Regions:
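Motif-centric detector for short Cys/His coordination patterns
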Residues: 1-101
Length: 101
């Protein structure tokens, strides 16, 4: 049963990787004051940190410490304790519903 569950999880991950946007890299561009995400598809997406929960008001040094998750489906800032889903960011979700209201 455990092997079956692992196989199903791997299959789901393969499908998600094929149809959902994944980040190849991400960085903070201080000159434009934007977080830039380079997607595996070759497209680029960027947004100002001021509109994102946990990033608003952060220093350029802290914003520059963005990490892409190994699967490419998330961004993480350790010092800021901030995490974002790449598909959610592309859909315009920059925080919780309460924060965005």
């Amino acid at each position: 049963m455990k092997e079956y569950a692992i196989a199903k999880a791997r299959e789901a991950a393969t499908i998600a990787n094929a149809v959902e946007p994944r980040a190849e890299s991400a960085y903070y561009d201080q000159s434009s004051d934007r977080i830039v995400i380079n997607l595996k598809s070759g497209a680029t997406f960027s947004f100002p940190p001021e509109i994102a929960q946990g990033l608003a008001g952060a220093s350029p040094e802290d914003l520059a410490e963005v990490e892409v998750t190994p699967s490419g489906d998330g961004l993480h800032w350790e010092k800021l304790d901030a995490d974002f889903s790449v598909p959610a960011l592309l859909a315009g979700v920059f925080g919780t519903a309460v924060w965005m209201a």
